[in-house]
């Protein structure tokens, strides 16, 4: 028999990055750069958590740096033509000069041509004279920091003839939180990210027109003032150092690393959300059975199915194939596609994101300059390692994965909110009567807006390449543009995931309350049905009576679910009335034919009245008790329970009780004071997701479910790359 495969390398690798980041952010941790071992976790640690970086003391590394500088000096002494050192740049490389230092200044001068707003270059607030609200034109600080780290690591490989002190200057800025203000647009990532990197090079020169932001205080000073604060002298570049600083993919690779870290988190979260959705909709665990994935053995599908199947193994809400109540003649024989094909949908995204992770890791530890110096052979090579197409490829896969996961979440969420599809849950997931409460209707609309925007963003940037720079750069990767738009897809999918998680917690509460209601009401309804049976046939056998009770309850539950759009009193009456007809057909008519019609109808009317009252009273009592003592965790699988309790307890996002939770609703009790908007509650989830707070609970979901069996002690190649 095929066994569940929850040992997927992708999940392990992503979880490994979480642990790696935790280790790096411990007090006293430091990133050691050696040109060989930089990973995404280290980039995130430096860019987002102020973890300092320094150069390895490995003597071989320092020897490589020295030898590359010496090799270039020999080539120039021998009169060799070296692009960008004694020639012009790009389509102007037909010029020659021996004024090497001035040529490097000319390079950083002409590339610093991007647009920044006055407010980007100062500590002041945006001016009101721009009525349309100009948003910042500067690169996010975290991206600039990531680029600084990545460029240092690449230069340490010793193929660019850049002195160690140049690299140390960059790291001094980075460690002190003095970050150049860099335009967000202007790079085509062809000969690397020339324009944005030129702002870092200009900062090292002490250019007074370069703005430097103090990350700790928000103050903005000039680059020459920043050098004075650091106790550093302005640099005068060696023959190839300006080119070595600019001619690389650091901004693309740095931005891609930050995007990838969050995107991978969302891929894991989508699997937990699918498990929660399966429970909320009373779906089938059979959707994710290992046999299904095993006979179509795509690696990603096997991993996704294995994870979700393991998550659900201890659920009391999801149904199992062949279990009592798993299906009814009146319900769909199988779940709709949003759940049933989730593993087939997530699987290819896992495969794409695995490859994207490998591509970005490789780029972080690559030499992306031109020309390249090989001290070992004494040769120099003119080529195109600055073309960042691998990053473009990784980011376009990421954009596609985010859109595909968004489409799945959108389908699951809209099914959850729609009473025609959600298997008996109230419309709009309202906790109170639906005539005056429309809880998730706004989120339903929000999700449509998010989905439309996410789909718009998912267009291959590489389709829009334009020839540049005298047609010398006829091909250019647009990798930084791709990274920027991939970041947008991560943002929008994070909004969708947050809204969906809010709706899921509400739905799980409603489902649990429903199960409590069924448990409380069943015995009374069975007693009333038994009394009705005996009034028609005093000699009815116990087994026949039980059969009638079971059939009646099933019919009653069916009509209860179908009338979820009605307020409680009407819903109870409708369910009982529609069930009455089926019950009459089941009753053994053994009364004397001479018995008067009113006499025969009286027991039926009594049953109808009492069952209606029982349903309404039981549901109302259950609902009231549930508010103060929710039993939802009891029914959930381990993974769902941890995510649910994280939202409810960790983030303080409560069950939405309906109109009484509106902040301005008239209330006579203090318990209703301080209520928040639905959007404010979703915002708590969103900020926690974007702030990295979800990493711990995601790890708990995997470890608590034992979904990644054999994880401890097993090192994966992919994990080290992430």
Swiss-Prot record:
Pfam families to which the protein is assigned, alphabetical: Lyase_aromatic
Domain of life: Eukaryota
GO-annotated molecular function: ammonia-lyase activity
Pathway given in the UniProt record: Alkaloid biosynthesis
GO CC entries: cytoplasm
Assigned EC number: 4.3.1.24
Swiss-Prot/TrEMBL keywords: Alkaloid metabolism, Lyase
PTM comment text: Contains an active site 4-methylidene-imidazol-5-one (MIO), which is formed autocatalytically by cyclization and dehydration of residues Ala-Ser-Gly.
Residues at which (E)-cinnamate binds: 247, 334, 340, 370, 441, 469, 472
Sites bearing 2,3-didehydroalanine (Ser), chain numbering: 191
CDD domains registered for this protein in UniProt: PAL-HAL (cd00332)
PROSITE patterns in UniProt: PAL_HISTIDASE (PS00488)
Disruption of the gene: reported phenotype: Abolishes the biosynthesis of lentopeptins A and B.
Biological processes per GO annotation: L-phenylalanine catabolic process
Catalytic activity: L-phenylalanine = (E)-cinnamate + NH4(+)
Active-site residues, Swiss-Prot/TrEMBL: 83 (proton donor/acceptor)
Annotated crosslink 5-imidazolinone (Ala-Gly) location: 190-192
Region feature (Disordered): 117-136
Similarity remark: Belongs to the PAL/histidase family.
Function summary: Phenylalanine ammonia-lyase; part of the gene cluster that mediates the biosynthesis of the ergot alkaloids lentopeptins A and B. Within the pathway, lenB provides the cinnamic acid starter unit for the synthesis of the N-acyldiketopiperazine intermediate by the NRPS lenA. Cinnamic acid is condensed with the Ala-Val-Ala peptide chain by lenA which leads to the N-acyldiketopiperazine intermediate which in turn is converted into lentopeptins A and B by the cytochrome P450 monooxygenase lenC.
Name of the protein this chain belongs to: Phenylalanine ammonia-lyase lenB
